[in-house]
Amino acid sequence: MKAWLQSSISYYTGTAEPVYGPEAIQPVTASVQGINPFHRLEADDFKWSTPSSSHVETQVFYIKPNEGDYMCFVQLIHSNLGSWTTTAQSTCRIFDLKHPENDLWTSTNMDQFSFENDKTSFVAKNCSVVLEDQKRYRIRASINMDSIIDITVHQDAPPFKIGEDGNSTYGTDPSKPWASMKHTFWPRTRVEGSIVARGRVVDVTGPGMFVHALQNGKPHHLASSWEFALLQHKKFTAIMMQFKTPPSYGSTIVNIGGIAMKDKIISATVDNTIEHVETTLDPDTEWHEPTRISYEWDGKDAETYTEDIHLSVDAPLGRRLQRIDVLAEIPSWLKGFVHGVSGTKPFIYQYFSPVKFTLKMGDEVIEDEATLFNETTFIS
C-alpha cells in the first residue's frame, strides 16, 4: 500500500518545482515575432513522438456531423507519467445538442498497442488509426461496444504548425531543454463514416478539425490552465489553443491559432487574446467558469505576410456540455490528499454555442454566424 501510495502521489504531483522564472520557458510564439509563423508540416510532424520520459501525447478528431444536431470527438491518448507504465486510451464523445440525455461518453484502455508505418499510425487490439498518404486518417475501433467507430478523416486545408518545429521548450539552458509542448493542426477536415452509439448508428459525415498535441513533461508542471476554441462556419474555420504556465515559469501565457478558408490557410496567428468576460462560481469545484467569453485572432496573411487579418468573437456561452473531473479515476481520499499536497485540482469545462463573428482581411469585412466549441481547463 505504501509503495502504491507513493507512486500515485508521484504520478499526480511529481516533485515540487523551483521558481525558475519566465526566462526558463522559450515560447514558440517568441521565435516568430515579426515573421510569418505559418509552417507546413514536414514528414516527422506526422509521427507519434512517444518519448520515454513523462509525457502525454494525444490525437483528437473533432466532428460536426451534417445530419442531426450533434458535436463529436474521437481521441487517442498515449501517456507515461512518473513511475507508471505507459498506457494508451481511447475516448469517444457524442453530444446530442437537443437531447443531452442521449449524450455518449466512453473511455477505454487499450491492450497490445504499437506504432506502425514509421510511427505515423497507431494499432491496438480491435483498434487502428492509420495515416494514408499524409492526406487522411482511417479510423476503426471496436474496443468498446458502446462506441464502434468506422470513419475516414480527409484533409481539406493544409495542416500547419507555428514556427519551424512548433515547440515551446522549458529549461534554463535553451540548448538543453528538459520539457516541451507542441501542437500541429489540420484546421479543416472532411469526415465520412459512422459511430454505432449504444446500438444506434450515428452518421457523423461532416466537417471537422484534427489536432496532434504533445506535452513532453509532467502536465501540471508545464501548464496551470488551458483554453481551446474551435469556430466552425461553412467556409471558415478558426482554432485557438492557449496555455498558461505555473508560477515556476513566470505564469507565462502562450497562445497559438489559425484561420482557414475552404482549402487554404488565411493566417497562422500568435498575437491572440482570450477573456472570460463574465463568470460564475462553480460551488462543486470552486473554479470560476466562464459564462461569456471573448476571442481575438490577430495576424497577417499566411501567403505574403503583408495583409492584416483579424477575427473576433464575443458571445455568451451556450450549454455546458460537460465538466470533466480529471482525477475522477483515483480514490476520493487520495484525490483530496493530492490536492492538498500539490494544489492540483484539474477540471475541464466544455461548451457549444451559436455565435456571431467578425473577420477582417485587409479592407474586406465579413460578419456571419458560426458555431463555437470551446474548452476551459483549470489545473492549479
Curated annotation (Swiss-Prot):
Subcellular location field: Golgi apparatus, cis-Golgi network membrane; Endoplasmic reticulum membrane; Cytoplasm; Nucleus
Record keywords: Cytoplasm, Endoplasmic reticulum, Golgi apparatus, Lipid transport, Membrane, Nucleus, Transport
Membrane topology reported for the UniProt record: Peripheral membrane protein
Keyword Acyltransferase: no
Main location: Golgi
Peripherally associates with membranes, as annotated region: 1-18
Gene Ontology terms for molecular function: ceramide binding
Keyword presence, Cytoplasm: yes
Xref: InterPro entries: AttH-like_dom_sf, Ceramide-binding_SVF1, Svf1-like_C, Svf1-like_N
Cross-referenced Pfam families: Svf1, Svf1_C
GO CC annotation: cis-Golgi network membrane; cytoplasm; cytosol; endoplasmic reticulum membrane; nucleus
Single biological process term from Gene Ontology: sphingolipid biosynthetic process
Superkingdom of origin: Eukaryota
Job of this protein: Ceramide-binding protein that may transfer ceramides from the endoplasmic reticulum membrane to the cis-Golgi network membrane, and is thereby required for the biosynthesis of complex sphingolipids.
Protein family according to the UniProt entry: Belongs to the SVF1 family.
Name of the protein in its database record: Ceramide-binding protein svf1
Record organism: Schizosaccharomyces pombe (strain 972 / ATCC 24843)
Gene name of the encoded protein: svf1
